[in-house]
Amino acid sequence: MLKIEAVIRPEKLELVCAKLRRIGYPGMMVMEMEGHGRQGGLHPHWPEGLRVNFLPKVRMEIVVENKDKAKVITAIVSGARTGEEGDGKIFISEIKEAIRIRTGERGSKALSKDRDFSLRK
């Protein structure tokens, strides 16, 4: 299993989530955060010279089966990319074990994959 962490623009979150749901990955963790990379706290739509130390970002974490790595990354990139600096980064790390606390399921059975969440209110 792999943990895929993506730092993206907040306004791209809904589109990325929709793309992940379409490929069978509805479950993820999302955290609001601030940061900057090469753009150094500049936003292309702000007045020239306006600079802040950090820009709003969203970090999403999703644990996937190894075989799904490429399609999950494709979904994130296609939903998050604007082509401008500040689109974000993706980090991938190995997960040794996953355990669903409620049921005790382990490994890939503990992942929220291919489950129908459309019936939830």
Where are each of the predicted segments found?
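Positively charged, small/polar-rich N-terminal and surface patches that mediate targeting and assembly
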Residues: 1-121
